[in-house]
Regions:
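N-terminal phosphate-binding caps/lids of nucleotide- and nucleic-acid-binding domains
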Residues: 1-234
């Protein structure tokens, strides 16, 4: 938020739980230009306007409105899956594209984001391996997709991209799906913070695991156990 405020104009409205009044702030280029008490609901609303207005060179690298909107939508989807306890609402050109209920049910978030057909073809995953726990959902072998865009991984509630985790999931489906088809999944891996380094990529979407073999095995066997139970195999 600090980085965004340094290159935009921001109107912020916030009130803490139990506070009598809220506060309205107006910032430009990271500087607070006005601050005043106001009556408002609990929570925080942030309006960002004129992004990169003071850095025209950066503005030249902005993609089309459609591309930038798609990128923002993707981030909102990731956060909605990582935090089903928070309600997310995304509007584009005044039209609601996504609304999650914030009731803490990850399946409800999956339903809101990916739709009924995918949600109805997912199996729950919950397995432990050493100090790791793997939770979430994977699709049945009969409900695969044509690419990996439907795979979402979270480590300690942080969205990441990981070939290792994709490989672990796909290995569990070996001989169960056709070549060129991929399982969809939403998986959360909980692990000790010292077991993962999140500072290997500027966007922090790539991580380095202290023990890749252990992480691979934890995810692989958790998913394999789910598929075996669903198929009636011991």
């Amino acid at each position: 938020l600090a980085a965004i405020s340094s290159v935009s104009k921001i109107d912020l409205l916030t009130r803490a739980q139990g506070a009598e009044n809220g506060v309205r702030l107006h910032l430009e280029a990271g500087k607070v230009l006005s601050e005043e008490p106001v009556g408002c609901p609990c929570g925080t609303t942030i309006l960002v306007r004129e992004l990169f207005y003071n850095t025209p060179a950066r503005m030249k690298f902005m993609k089309s409105d459609a591309a930038e909107s798609s990128a923002v939508f993707s981030v909102v989807q990731q956060q909605a899956l990582a935090h089903p306890e928070i309600s997310f609402r995304f509007l584009k050109d005044g039209q609601e594209q996504l609304h999650t209920d914030g009731q803490g049910d990850r399946m409800a978030a999956i339903y809101a984001i990916y739709g009924r057909e995918l949600a109805n073809n997912m199996l729950p995953v919950d397995g432990s391996w050493e100090k790791l726990r793997v939770r979430g959902f994977v699709t049945k072998p009969t409900a695969t997709r044509g690419n990996r865009a439907w795979q979402s991984f979270f480590v300690n509630n942080r969205y990441i991209k990981s070939r290792l985790l994709s490989a672990a999931v796909e290995e569990a489906y070996r001989n169960q799906i056709m070549v060129g088809r991929f399982p969809a999944c939403v998986l959360e891996i909980d692990m000790p913070v010292q077991a993962v380094d999140v500072n290997v990529h500027p966007a922090k979407t790539e991580v380095k695991f202290l023990s890749e073999r252990e992480v691979f095995d934890a995810v692989h066997y958790a998913v394999l156990s789910t598929l075996s139970r669903a198929a009636g195999r011991p």
